Structures are given as structure tokens and as C-alpha cells.
Amino acid sequence: MPKFDVSKRDLERLVGKTFSVEEWEDLFLYAKCELDDVWEENGEIYFKADSKDTNRPDLWSAEGIARQIRFALGFQKGLPKYEIEKSDVVVYVDEKLKDIRPYGVYAIVEGLNIDEEALRQMINLQEKVALTFGRRRREVAIGIFDFDKVKPPIYYRAAEKTEKFVPLGYDEEMTLEEILEKHEKGREYGHLIKDKPYYPLLVDSEGKVLSMPPVINSETTGRVTTETKNVFVDITGWDLNKVMLALNVVVTALAERGGKIKSVKVVYPDFEIETPDLTPKEFEVELDYIRKLAGLELSDGEIKELLERMMYEVELENRRAKLRYPAFRDDIMHARDVLEDVLIAYGYNEIEPEEPKLAVQGRGDKFIEFEDAVRELMVGFGLQEVMTFNLTNREAQYDRMNLPCGEHQEECRDYFNHPPAELVEIENPISPKWSALRNWLIPSLLDFLSQNTHEEYPQKLFEVGKATLIDESRETKTVSESKLAVALAHPRVTFTEAKEILEGVMRHLGFEYELEEAEHPSFIPGRVGKIIVNGETIGVIGEIHPAVLENWGIEMPVAAFELFLAPLYTEPYL
């Protein structure tokens, strides 16, 4: 969870009222934070805020916390208002960036009065949003520049690796390749672009470099100081919705410091947009649902008042609430999310506890204990556990795995359930990247390896996780199966090394098994087999096909296996 430092004096300046340290401990709860530490430095009191919500990047700075508290205390109600003035600035996006880092969104914020604490919060917000929400700059990277040093129009273009500029913190030019090799940020984030044919570059009309997203800003325009009055904000990434949200978070935080927001026209090869877009989002909720789940006898008017203190605009109609909420939020997906805000405004400490009417005695789930035992076993074999997302997409599950499914479902076939021919897909996904539930785990491990090619080898991974399969006999038409997957990556890895770990698993769990040679496009022919226990095929083992490794951008050989855990579930776990 994000942690960051804030000044008590700065928070109180933004809220408009002073409080004791004890009062601040309670106030932080309105912003879904806990007060982790308090200390004094040069006569100033500082807090370490520990955010408890990874879906609210708008609360990861002093500006966001202060805004939330102002509304929660009733100093303001309803939607926060931000005006956007249209500028004549245009950013042109190069078509060559489509497969490199396709999306950039931009804004101008003018009239800032930046002191040292405001500058520290600006840098903190950049770093926390890019690190956590942006997954270490892979999905979101942020640049803030001194706009007075920039000459529009601006170009987000593909650059040759031999082009030069002075990176932030240096006083001499370096080529883009040299930056990735020698600059601290280049070594840290260069793996995100180093294998691309071109590198992204943001330049103005005079050819002056602003930044090399997502790695480093230029020294010329990318150093913001307390003397800076007008800034240009740049957000790049792979998902347009995600970079738009990050832009909304940053510009509204700067507006809390008195800045005036101006929009920028962004011209893509096949469409144009004006950014930022702060149009409020909409949602509807049944008031009786709120009352029932809250367990509180709240009137319609009380629910309305509580929601207005959480930055909603509320219209009551036919026992329902039509809601509009700020564009810097993207976490309202269900009525329960609205209920959470109602309870935060009401105050969890104000809810009277009740003793359960039915005495129950809990115990651990036996199958979960079995899964934990398997995890301990794998750690004992020297493997590192990873926990990846259940949500994925068809490309990752089939296309990148060299399987003939893609968009043509009729071409799919069942590779002894690794993977099955059918994929559970989401009807209206928020992002194409998260458009399906995975039906096998090896692609998730390869994705992890592809994101860590800059780390040392060998890399030996395992995951105990869920795969979702079609099952027409069930009410939901699906079933989630627990599986074990292992991936080994280093220059000398072989089928035998993976087989030795598989043998260790079977021996410790008390099972005899057989391997039967099989055909599977994800693996090298002749080096792949079915895992058979009690006459039933429960998994697959083999060396990953070079075409698959190339699809994932992995340069090391990989051996892997995957199997269902349920057939191995016996005493003493039953």
C-alpha cells in the first residue's frame, strides 16, 4: 500500500483549519489512510500517511487528503468544481509508437505558487501514481515540465536510438542508448523499451527534448522548481482510460494549489481528443440496498447528505439515488462501493457493535491447508512464489502461446485442459487487457518472466492459483480449479530439471505418476508430455517453444509444468 509523508502545516493550509495530532489521527480515516508515524523536523510536524486503498490514487498526496477531509467535514459539499480553459496547444502522436508506447495525454496548469512542500508533494504524487497505479511505469508514466521553456506544438514521436539530449541530473548530452545503460533511471526502467525498434521521445517545435517516456525527463525543461509558475503535464502508457485517469488525478491536485487548468488537443493518426476530460461520472443505487447492507435506519435525506460529504452530486428519485462523482475516481463499480463511502462519512466508530445471535466455531478450510502445504513444498525446492492476476485476455492465453485460437474460436482445440478450447470472457471489459478469466497459469508465469528480463538468472517461479473452466453442469456454467504451475528460466534449463521438481512433488504427496509424450504447440516437439495420475491426465510438462518465448520477449530458455491439485488432494488434508 502507498505510504507518503505530509506536513501538518501544509495539510491545514489546504483544509483551511488547524487540528491537534490526535484529531488528525481520526481525520485520516476519511481519506482511507492511517497515521503511521508522527515526527518533528526543523520545527515542523510531519505525518507518514499509510493509504489503505490502491484504487484511489487521488488520495496519495496532501492535496487529495485535504480535499477529501474538507468535504467530509462539510466545509464543501457535492462535486468539487474545476474549470478547464481551452488552449491552442497541440500534441501530435507518431503512428510508429503504436506498438511501443501508444498513448499520451496532456494538460497545462498555470498560475502556480510552489513552495518547497508543494514541490515535494508534486514529486511524491508523480512517483506514487507511476509506481503503484502505473505498475512501475509500465502502464503509467508521468512527466511535469516548466511550460515557459516549451515551444508548442509538441510532438510525441518515435526516435532513433542515436539521438541525444541532456537527461535530468546531468550536464552533458547522451544518446538514448547511453541513457538506458548509464543513467540511474535508465538502468531502472530501460527494460520497458530497450527491445523496441525506436524509443519514445517528447519534443517541442524547436526540437527541444522534454522527456524520454517512461524513463527520464530532460534537464532543460524537466526540472520544476519553486520558481516555476506554469507546468505542462505529460502522461504516457498502454491504456487510454488509465492514462486519462492519472492525468485527472495530477491536474486536480495541482488545481488544489491554485493552478488554472488548460486543455491540450492530442492528435493521433486516426482520432483526436481534448485532454484532460473532467466530465463527472454517473452511477445509480437503490436507497433500500444501502440501508439494508449498512444495517442503519437512514432516511433518504441522510443518505443524500452523507454522499454529498463524499464528493457526490445526488438526485433522489423513486427510492433511488442518481449519482455524479469526480472524474479523478474510477473505483465505483458496484453499489457496495457507494455504501463504503456512506459508512466512511457516517463514521465506522459511530456504528454500535452487536453480538452474534448464533454461536459458531470456525476452522481452517482443509483444501486451503493442502494448498499451503504445496506452497511450502515448492519453497523447499528453492522456488519463488508469485501471485498473478486471474484476469487476462485471449491474446495472452492463446495467441502468445502459439495456439491456433485467437479470434477464431472454431479453430480452437482442447490440449488436455492445458488449456481447454473455451475461454470465459467478460462481456463489457473496462480494458482489453483484462477481458477474460485465465484457464491455465503458465501464460501468467511467462508474463511475469517477460517483465523481469532485467533481473538476475536463474529465475525459478511457481504459483498456486485458480483457473476458470467452462462447466455446463453448474449453475454458473463455470468452475474454478486450483492448479500448480512452475516455470524455470536460465541458460541451461532442461526438461529434466522440471521433471525432477515434478517427481519431488509427487513423492512428497504420495502419488505414482506417468509421463506420456504429447503434441502441444506451446512446447518444443519431443520435449513435452502429459502428466498422468491414476489413469487421468492432470497436467502438462515441457520446454517452452522458442516462438512462444519470442512472443513474450523472453531471451532465456524456459521449462515449465502445470497440473490440477484436486486429484492430489488426500489424507492428511481430508
From Swiss-Prot:
NCBIfam families: pheT_arch
Organism: Thermococcus kodakarensis (strain ATCC BAA-918 / JCM 12380 / KOD1)
GO biological process terms, semicolon-separated: phenylalanyl-tRNA aminoacylation
One function term, GO molecular function aspect: ATP binding
UniProt entry keywords in alphabetical sequence: Aminoacyl-tRNA synthetase, ATP-binding, Cytoplasm, Ligase, Magnesium, Metal-binding, Nucleotide-binding, Protein biosynthesis
Enzyme Commission number(s) from the entry: 6.1.1.20
Name this protein carries in UniProt: Phenylalanine--tRNA ligase beta subunit
Pfam families xrefs: B3_4, B5, tRNA_synthFbeta
Annotated positions binding Mg(2+): D331, D337, E340, D341
Gene name of the encoded protein: pheT
